[in-house]
C-alpha cells in the first residue's frame, strides 16, 4: 500500500516544502480554533472573538484575524470566562453595586457637604447631638440598659422629639417650638399602646406619668397633658405593637410604614428572641437549631440592612448581662445574649445607674458646683465617624417624664472631656 500510493515520494515533497519556523504559528492557531469550537459546542457565542460566518465585513474579519493571532490561548479563554462570570455576578451572586473610581463624584460630595453637613434630626437632650450628630438616615443606633434604667423611656423621648413640633419646657414655663415634624414609627415588643401613649404624654407635657395614670394633677398639669394629647394627635408618630415577631415581620412593618406614612425614623424596642424568630430561623436553616447569639446577630444585621436598603434611621436596644454591675468600661461585652449585636451598629451606648463609687471618683468635678449630681451615666462605646467614644455622658434623669439630660462628659477614668453642646435645627424637609 505504501509503495502503490507513492508515499515515499509524497514524504520527500512534504519535507522539501515544509517550513519548520511556521510550525508554532499553525499549531497555536489549531489549538485556538479547537478551543473556540469547544466553547461553541456548549452553546457559548464566541463570534465576538472570531465569526466564521462573516464574509461581508472584511474590515471586521481582518481585525478578528489579527486579534486572534496576537492573543494567547489563555487570553482567549479568559475573555470568554469573563463574560460567563459577569452573567453569574448579575444573576447568581447576591451582591449589589459595582466598584467605582475613588474620585467619582468627589467635588459634588464636597459641594453637598458645604450646603448640608452630615447630621440628622436632633435627638433629645444636650450634648447627645454633639456625640451622635443627630439621628442620621441609613444609620443604626443601639442604646442598651439594665432593666428599669430607661432604655424604653429614652427612646420614647427621642421619637417624640423628632415627630412632634412642640414640647413643654419648665425653664420657660411654656411650650416651645421643636423644629419640623418627621414621620416616626415606634415598634413596641413588650408594652401595649396605652403604656406607650402615657409615656409620650408625660414627655411632651413634662408631667410625671404617675400623675397621668392616677389622674392626680397638680397646678396646670392637666391642661398641659391635654395640650400634649392634641400635639400627639396631629403628629406623624405611629405605634405598632409587635409582641411575637420574626425577622420578616420587622421588615414588613417598616416597609408598610414607609409606604403608608413616608416613615424615615424607626425606634424598635427591643432586640430579643421570640418564638416566631426561632421558628423562622429553624425553618430557614433546614431544621438546624442556632444558638441565641447567632439569632440576635441576625436580627441586628437585618436592622442594619433595612437602614441601608430603605434609607431610614433605626434605633434599637438590648438588655444587659450580669457583668454590668462590676464593669469599669461598659461596652459591647455587657450586651445580653451576644456582644456581636454591636458589630453592625453605627453608634452604641449603654445606660447605667450611677453608683456610690462613681460619685466618689467624680468628687473633684462635682465640687465645682457647675453640675448637679448625676443619677444615670451613658457609656458611649462605639461611634462610627464620630470623635467621642470610650466616654461617659453623666446625666440627671426624671424617668417619670422620660427626660434624661446629659450634663458633662468624662473618660472611663473620670477625666473631664471638653465638649460643646451642638444644636441641630431643621427648618425644611430633612435632606439627610
What is each stretch, according to the model?
Residues 1-83:
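Accessory, often N-terminal, substrate/partner-engagement and coupling regions
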Residues 237-306:
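Phosphate-binding/switch loop-helix module in NTP-utilizing enzymes
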Residues 146, 241-244, 276-297, 323-341, ...:
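Short, contiguous acidic/charged loop-to-helix segments that flank catalytic cores in large enzymes
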Residues 122, 129-131, 165-262, 388, ...:
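Cytosolic-facing regulatory segments adjacent to core modules
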Amino acid at each position: 500500500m505504501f509503495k502503490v500510493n507513492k508515499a515515499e515520494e509524497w514524504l520527500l515533497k512534504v519535507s522539501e516544502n515544509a517550513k519548520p519556523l511556521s510550525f508554532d504559528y499553525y499549531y497555536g492557531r489549531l489549538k485556538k480554533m479547537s478551543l473556540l469550537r469547544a466553547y461553541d459546542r456548549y452553546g457559548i457565542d464566541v463570534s465576538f472573538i472570531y465569526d466564521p460566518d462573516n464574509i461581508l465585513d472584511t474590515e471586521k474579519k481582518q481585525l478578528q484575524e489579527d486579534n486572534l493571532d496576537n492573543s494567547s490561548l489563555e487570553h482567549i479563554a479568559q475573555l470568554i470566562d469573563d463574560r460567563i462570570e459577569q452573567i453569574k455576578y448579575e444573576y447568581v451572586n447576591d451582591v449589589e453595586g459595582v466598584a467605582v473610581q475613588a474620585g467619582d463624584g468627589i467635588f459634588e460630595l464636597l459641594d453637598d457637604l458645604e450646603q448640608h453637613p452630615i447630621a440628622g434630626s436632633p435627638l433629645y437632650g444636650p450634648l447627645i447631638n454633639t456625640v451622635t450628630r443627630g439621628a442620621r438616615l441609613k444609620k443604626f443606633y443601639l442604646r442598651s440598659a439594665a432593666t428599669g434604667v430607661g432604655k424604653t423611656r429614652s427612646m420614647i423621648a427621642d421619637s417624640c422629639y423628632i415627630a412632634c413640633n412642640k414640647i413643654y419646657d419648665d425653664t420657660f414655663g411654656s411650650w416651645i417650638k421643636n423644629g419640623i415634624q418627621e414621620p416616626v414609627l415606634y415598634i413596641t415588643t413588650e408594652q401595649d399602646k396605652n403604656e406607650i401613649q402615657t409615656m409620650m404624654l408625660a414627655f411632651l407635657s413634662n408631667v410625671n406619668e404617675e400623675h397621668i395614670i392616677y389622674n392626680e394633677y397638680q397646678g396646670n398639669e392637666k391642661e398641659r397633658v391635654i395640650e400634649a394629647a392634641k400635639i400627639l394627635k396631629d403628629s406623624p408618630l405611629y405605634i405598632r405593637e409587635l409582641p411575637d415577631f420574626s425577622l420578616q415581620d420587622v421588615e414588613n412593618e417598616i416597609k408598610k410604614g414607609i409606604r403608608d406614612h413616608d416613615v424615615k425614623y424607626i425606634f424598635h424596642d427591643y432586640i430579643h428572641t421570640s418564638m416566631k424568630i426561632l421558628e423562622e430561623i429553624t425553618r430557614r436553616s433546614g431544621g438546624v437549631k442556632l444558638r441565641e447569639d447567632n439569632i440576635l446577630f441576625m436580627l441586628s444585621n437585618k436592622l442594619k440592612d433595612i437602614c441601608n436598603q430603605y434609607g431610614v434611621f433605626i434605633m434599637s436596644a438590648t438588655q444587659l448581662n450580669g457583668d454590668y454591675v462590676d464593669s469599669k468600661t461598659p461596652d459591647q461585652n455587657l450586651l445580653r445574649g451576644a456582644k456581636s449585636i454591636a458589630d453592625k451598629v453605627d453608634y452604641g451606648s449603654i445606660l447605667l445607674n450611677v453608683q456610690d463609687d462613681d460619685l466618689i471618683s467624680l468628687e473633684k468635678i462635682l465640687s465645682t458646683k457647675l453640675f448637679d449630681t448625676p443619677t444615670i451615666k451613658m457609656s458611649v462605646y462605639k461611634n462610627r465617624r464620630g470623635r467621642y467614644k470610650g466616654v461617659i455622658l453623666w446625666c440627671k434623669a426624671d424617668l417619670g417624664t422620660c427626660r434624661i439630660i446629659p450634663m458633662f462628659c468624662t473618660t472611663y477614668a473620670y477625666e473631664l472631656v471638653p465638649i460643646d453642646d451642638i444644636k441641630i435645627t431643621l427648618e425644611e424637609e430633612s435632606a439627610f
